[in-house]
A protein has these predicted regions:
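Metal-dependent active-site segment of extracytoplasmic phospho-/sulfohydrolases and closely related
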Residues: 1, 162-204
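Short, structured active-site-proximal loop/turn typified by the sulfatase FGly-forming signature C/S-X-P-X-R
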Residues: 1-33
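Loop/turn elements at helix/coil->beta-strand transitions in domains of secreted/extracellular proteins
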Residues: 2-6, 32, 79-85, 129-135, ...
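Structural recognition of the beta-strand scaffold that forms the well-ordered cores
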Residues: 6-9, 23-25, 73-76, 83-88, ...
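Surface-exposed patches in mature extracellular/periplasmic domains of secreted proteins
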Residues: 6-13, 87-89, 255, 314, ...
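Second-shell loop/turn segments in exported
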Residues: 8-11, 58-64, 74, 106-108, ...
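His/Asp/Glu-rich, glycine-adjacent segments
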Residues: 28-150
Length: 342
């Protein structure tokens, strides 16, 4: 009630975890920052080998800053003689452009939300020049429960309540230190979530010989690389599948801002909301995201509180690529080139 909120935080395409986390902190669309999905290949095998970029426990790719082609806000801050400290923001444990946050933790799923907030509070206890200008953290439990049980399931609602309690714990800690009115807090989510009932699936093997293609991704979308360069032929065989849209690279909707990066495969098959694209043996989850960002269900949230934010203000939907410029402005640092604006 005493902060600001937006009617929604519009995600970038694809509405997946890593592309959106990196868009939030760089102000760039995925085709410019390079993290085009949670799982993808780079054709430059001399630089990256033949292994894909992927996320999850033990991913070495997600700790390799060479995959990112844009400057995250913590690098901007550190370059301008301020300090950034981060508790589990995707790729904050990678060296990017030769720079790391002053302090950071490698992602550990076992760390609960309260522990994550306690670490943020302890960093705020630093004095003078040691004190950070930028802090960030990430709660993963809402996403996990949304996938496993569906966005409206009891378990997911409980996970949201737990995240809310952890934020309450942060607020209490700031109040106890008498700094609540000095700190600007921005609470966002990287994407939304929609129900994906097990009855709504499209088995792509009914339309393609899977031996002829490399398929990257399952669920809301698939990127497809024909092994024999017969893009037109494969594309034609995918036209008109019910509950899908198919695009050649570079022909995706303009507001996706998706298509120029060499990591994007030649064909994109995109499912309608609630539908899942599968191959034999792939089981879909009860909730998913990655669909067209124009579906309201893919929206994230934006809530903010602090000296720069109006009290009791409710504004229209904003795009997450604008947050980087906003954060730079708050901290009085000069932003790197980006796709957003204030």
């Amino acid at each position: 009630a005493n902060g600001s909120k937006a009617d929604g935080l519009k995600t970038v395409y694809p509405s997946k975890t890593f592309p959106n986390h990196i868009s939030i902190v760089t102000g760039n669309y995925p085709s410019n920052h390079g993290i085009i999905s949670n799982y993808f290949y780079d054709p430059d095998t001399t630089k990256f080998g033949k292994r894909p970029f992927y996320i999850g426990a033990g991913s070495t790719a997600a700790q390799d800053g060479r995959w990112i082609n844009a400057e995250p806000v913590w690098v901007t801050v550190e370059k301008q003689s301020k300090r950034a400290m981060i508790m589990f923001w995707p790729m904050s444990d990678a060296e990017i452009m030769g720079i790391r946050p002053s302090e950071y933790y490698v992602y550990n799923e076992e760390s609960n939300n309260k522990e994550r907030m306690d670490q943020i509070l302890s960093w705020l206890d630093y004095n003078g020049n040691a004190r950070p200008s930028f802090l960030a953290s990430y709660f993963s439990s809402v996403d996990h429960n949304g996938h496993d049980h569906g966005p409206n399931a009891t378990q997911t609602i409980e996970a949201i309540a737990e995240a809310d309690q952890a934020i309450g714990h942060l607020i209490d800690g700031l109040e106890a230190r008498n700094i609540l009115d000095e700190v600007n807090i921005i609470i966002v989510s990287d994407h939304g979530m929609t129900e994906t009932p097990s009855s709504k699936y499209i088995n792509i093997a009914e339309y393609l010989n899977l031996d002829d293609v490399v398929i990257v991704g399952r669920g809301p979308f698939m990127e497809i690389r024909p092994k024999n360069d017969n893009v037109d032929e494969i594309y034609q065989s995918l036209i008109g599948i019910e509950h899908t849209q198919v695009f050649k690279k570079g022909e995706t909707p303009k507001d996706f801002h998706y298509g120029d990066n060499n990591r994007i495969e030649p064909i994109l098959l995109l499912a309608d909301e609630h539908w899942s694209l599968v191959t034999p043996g792939y089981s879909s989850s009860f909730g998913s995201h990655g669909y067209d960002p124009n579906y309201r269900s893919m929206n994230g949230i934006f809530v903010a509180h602090g000296p720069v934010f109006k009290s009791g203000f409710s504004g229209p939907e904003i795009r997450n690529v604008h947050l980087y410029e906003m954060m730079c402005s708050i901290m009085n640092v000069i932003p790197a080139n980006n796709d957003g604006s204030l």
